[in-house]
Amino acid sequence: MASVVPLKEKKLLEVKLGELPSWILMRDFTPSGIAGAFQRGYYRYYNKYVNVKKGSIAGLSMVLAAYVFLNYCRSYKELKHERLRKYH
Amino acid sequence: MNENLFTSFTTPVILGLPLVTLIVLFPSLLFPTSNRLVNNRFVTLQQWMLQLVSKQMMSIHNSKGQTWTLMLMSLILFIGSTNLLGLLPHSFTPTTQLSMNLGMAIPLWAGAVITGFRNKTKASLAHFLPQGTPTPLIPMLVIIETISLFIQPMALAVRLTANITAGHLLIHLIGGATLALMSISTTTALITFTILILLTILEFAVAMIQAYVFTLLVSLYLHDNT
């Protein structure tokens, strides 16, 4: 099925569900590609929440909240023994 | 309470890969650089704070000592941010590991001492003998001064490790005690909770003070030797 725009240049929200696997496989998975993805993501967040005229505490707090959440996921294995349950 | 109180201090490893590298590198994300004259609030605040700290800390040095400004400022930022991030729940504090603190203390101290020995050999050797000691005491005093010199990096590292580890342990213990006391007697639990609040405030202060002390001492050793 020929699309008007080639699959490679579509953004994620414009990709149809059936085309999703091929879209994912077409992404750039080289080290420089992955580094570019991280850099793009960082600057997207930075320019939206921090690098604005009246930045608030929310820009920093969201990062710290994500950090706390990731650390929780990392230590879940030890933490699940401390839940208040009768049988662990 | 963990089956072992120290499980929160183990180095995080995920599937055998050292996650600790990422955790050590994380604070660098919180200090964005900017080449502009007028920046956003976040960067402006950080630059203001950095200017305040660097003026206060580097004003005592001569021009040779002030070449260390970048090193000392990065040091205080790193230790301060790592300690403060460690106060978040479930996070891992790299400065609780003695290995890392030794890795910071020994090269910095050695750099300062060796600079002193290379450039001002007589003055550096003269540090081993305080002024006006009676002659019979000289050999013993030289030995004591040598020992006190070599203990400086150990003291730097152990001071930081012990302070941060002890604070975290206390928070764990008192938090666990509050939780356990909740079902037994609510008033005691409230008292323990107040203690926990005060302790947390103390820990915030300690986090920043320890960074300051570490950097200040390195700067002092530098001042002696330049």
Curated annotation (Swiss-Prot), chain A:
N-acetylalanine modified-residue sites: A2
Protein name: ATP synthase F(0) complex subunit f, mitochondrial
Chain positions found as N6-acetyllysine: K16
Membrane topology: Single-pass membrane protein
Residue positions where Phosphoserine is found in the record: S3
InterPro entries noted in UniProt: F1F0-ATPsyn_F_prd
GO biological process: proton motive force-driven mitochondrial ATP synthesis; proton transmembrane transport
Function: Subunit f, of the mitochondrial membrane ATP synthase complex (F(1)F(0) ATP synthase or Complex V) that produces ATP from ADP in the presence of a proton gradient across the membrane which is generated by electron transport complexes of the respiratory chain. ATP synthase complex consist of a soluble F(1) head domain - the catalytic core - and a membrane F(1) domain - the membrane proton channel. These two domains are linked by a central stalk rotating inside the F(1) region and a stationary peripheral stalk.
Quaternary context: Component of the ATP synthase complex composed at least of ATP5F1A/subunit alpha, ATP5F1B/subunit beta, ATP5MC1/subunit c (homooctomer), MT-ATP6/subunit a, MT-ATP8/subunit 8, ATP5ME/subunit e, ATP5MF/subunit f, ATP5MG/subunit g, ATP5MK/subunit k, ATP5MJ/subunit j, ATP5F1C/subunit gamma, ATP5F1D/subunit delta, ATP5F1E/subunit epsilon, ATP5PF/subunit F6, ATP5PB/subunit b, ATP5PD/subunit d, ATP5PO/subunit OSCP.
Keywords: Acetylation, ATP synthesis, CF(0), Hydrogen ion transport, Ion transport, Membrane, Mitochondrion, Mitochondrion inner membrane, Phosphoprotein, Transmembrane, Transmembrane helix, Transport
Keyword Cell cycle: no
GO cellular component, one term: proton-transporting ATP synthase complex
Localization of this protein: Mitochondrion; Mitochondrion inner membrane
TM ranges: 62-79
Lineage: superkingdom: Eukaryota
Organism listed in the record: Bos taurus (Bovine)
The family this protein is said to belong to: Belongs to the ATPase F chain family.
